[in-house]
Amino acid sequence: MSSRSASFLLRPAAALYGVVMSLRNHLYDRGAFKSWRSPIPVVSVGNITTGGTGKTPLVDWIVKFYEASGIPTAIVSRGYGRQTKGVQLVSDGKRILLGSRDAGDETAMLASRNPGTIVVVAEERVEGVQFLMREFADRLPGVIVLDDAFQHRKIARDLDIVVVNAGTPQELDAMLPAGRLREPLPGLSRADLIILSKITDDAKAAPLLQKLRETGKPVLRSKIKPGKLVKVDGSENGATEPAVKALAFAGIGAPEGFLHSLEKAGITVKATKFFRDHEPYTEAAIRSIIEESKRQEFVPVTTEKDWFRIADNPQLTEMLAQAGCRYLTIAPEFLDGTEELEKRLLSVLETKVVNWPLSPP
């Protein structure tokens, strides 16, 4: 069965899901469902589709902006793909306490990239925020960044940022499970700011850009900038290596973006192996990657997020280190609106912190 046929058959379920999400949003908008408001300013970064929008690099950029501005910051994330449940402290801002298996690959990467930041995972973000306020009452953060929380309306936010992938406009055509929309497009009316990410061609992105601007919300444009190609054995941490002939492997939501970043870095991709988003790597999968790389004399290259998923397993780590594996770092690069984003990020700091403890929501 073709993917188009499968999508058509799933349309009734998608329509029902859309009705449920619309009703849920309506009840929140009318006040029938309540959102708890944190006394610490909250910035939410989320998306309206599943996976692959560039949300995590943006969270990293925002945290670094606040820290550079002298504002202590905390991250609260769901920790997608983790094997733990409930509230877990990933980093206390002094040391990293959990790896990707217990924190989720994206959260583990954010904690590693921001060693001075408190990082908590919790399915219920309210519980995560209240936990960090209890546990860190002597050094409360000045702002909390929620990772992937646009649909998590149990907690109010002072700034709601939505990231949309410019490379896959067709994802906005159908609800889950027929498509990748998490909620109907009118939900974008809740956003304070929309970022059209991963732009590789201005002309191709123009129709989606116009569609997003019709929401009346400010729309910023960004692309992904490739960074360093890092050897996983730690022997080198420098610039990219254009001479590398790569076997690219990844388990992410939009692997075509990874391939584009490798191309922009001047790396020649000779072969690919892709897995499902957040899928755990097995010894057999890694062995297959290494064997093909050796046979073809290619270098195995993956994403930084994938590497954090692998790094919890010493055996797989050693296998890839001996094979000369690298991972590519990335960062968002704004094509316009940087000052607008920074202005809005600073404006939320006008919210005052009140005394803890608070009444439960």
From Swiss-Prot:
GO biological process, one term: lipopolysaccharide core region biosynthetic process
EC number(s) given by UniProt: 2.7.1.130
Principal EC category: transferase
Cross-referenced SUPFAM superfamilies: P-loop containing nucleoside triphosphate hydrolases
Protein's UniProt keywords contain Nucleotide-binding: yes
Keywords for the protein's UniProt record, in alphabetical order: ATP-binding, Kinase, Lipid A biosynthesis, Lipid biosynthesis, Lipid metabolism, Nucleotide-binding, Transferase
Gene Ontology molecular-function annotations: ATP binding; tetraacyldisaccharide 4'-kinase activity
Recorded metabolic or biological pathway in which this protein acts: Glycolipid biosynthesis; lipid IV(A) biosynthesis; lipid IV(A) from (3R)-3-hydroxytetradecanoyl-[acyl-carrier-protein] and UDP-N-acetyl-alpha-D-glucosamine: step 6/6
Gene Ontology CC: plasma membrane
Reactions accelerated catalytically: a lipid A disaccharide + ATP = a lipid IVA + ADP + H(+)
Binding site for ATP: 49-56
Keyword ATP-binding annotated: yes
Signal sequence residues: none
Task of the protein: Transfers the gamma-phosphate of ATP to the 4'-position of a tetraacyldisaccharide 1-phosphate intermediate (termed DS-1-P) to form tetraacyldisaccharide 1,4'-bis-phosphate (lipid IVA).
HAMAP family documented for this protein: LpxK
Family stated for the protein in its record: Belongs to the LpxK family.
Protein name from the UniProt record: Tetraacyldisaccharide 4'-kinase
Encoding gene, per UniProt annotation: lpxK
